[in-house]
């Protein structure tokens, strides 16, 4: 954490100022724009909703605005970790987060609403089919929309006056890679550790050692001081004691770029993939909606094919997205 700014080394964004190339800054700060516009939590969520309605999704129900939590309450303690909820098997969808005027929260809103619009899309399916095609699809849907929060999109909605030139692309891509690509090893190892524990391959007296062995194998990181079996470091990750599967986040990192490439093509985007936004594209919205409405009623390869035309998950879209950054690193 003292080196990378994250206790699990799952996000390396905090080292960006140390590694980004000179002259490659984005040219704008979305956080500063949101603050200067005095854009409050409700308007930030309304902006996220308008992204989805621009794709021809129905607006969120009135109950969403009354029952969601957007601001940290002053009269009680709450868990501010952002989450999306579907509460009555009909149309009572909500989000729960303590929204600040930051670029991160602006993107998170677009992500969390992806869960809500997915939940509404499969609402008319039998109850057993009211879920995503596999665990990764739910996370990937919101992440896909977050990939469309580009400078081009910010210009269209009036938050930027002009699109920065291509010289800023390396810095923007580096920032996203430090969050997305750096996450992949950690996203893979959490459930690898859990499966080894459940199978008995790792015994209780080696829980912590097995955790750090995987951290070193996949992430190349080691503890700053000795961590014996008197510690239980995996338990510091919320998803372990909460019994929440973690592979879904690894899969989502692959799927979101595959979804984004397919939808960008449907939207007719001819720019480099990292500059494409599907905002306002009803054809892209129709393709996305067709997949979301399937819910869990079909095997996940069918849902993937409905959106991308392929039946296998494919990381080549991630490679395509970061191609300009890869070329810069090669130089």
Language model: regions and residue ranges:
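Post-HEXXH active-site segment of zinc metalloproteases
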Residues: 98, 107, 119-145, 158-160
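Short pre-active-site segment immediately N-terminal to the catalytic Zn-binding motif
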Residues: 34-39, 90-110
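A short glycine/serine-rich beta->alpha loop
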Residues: 100, 128-132, 238-245
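NTP-dependent nucleotidyl-transfer catalytic core
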Residues: 1-4
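A short coil-to-beta-strand element that immediately follows conserved catalytic motifs
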Residues: 59-65
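Short, solvent-exposed loop/turn segments at the edges of secondary structure
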Residues: 88-92, 137-140, 188
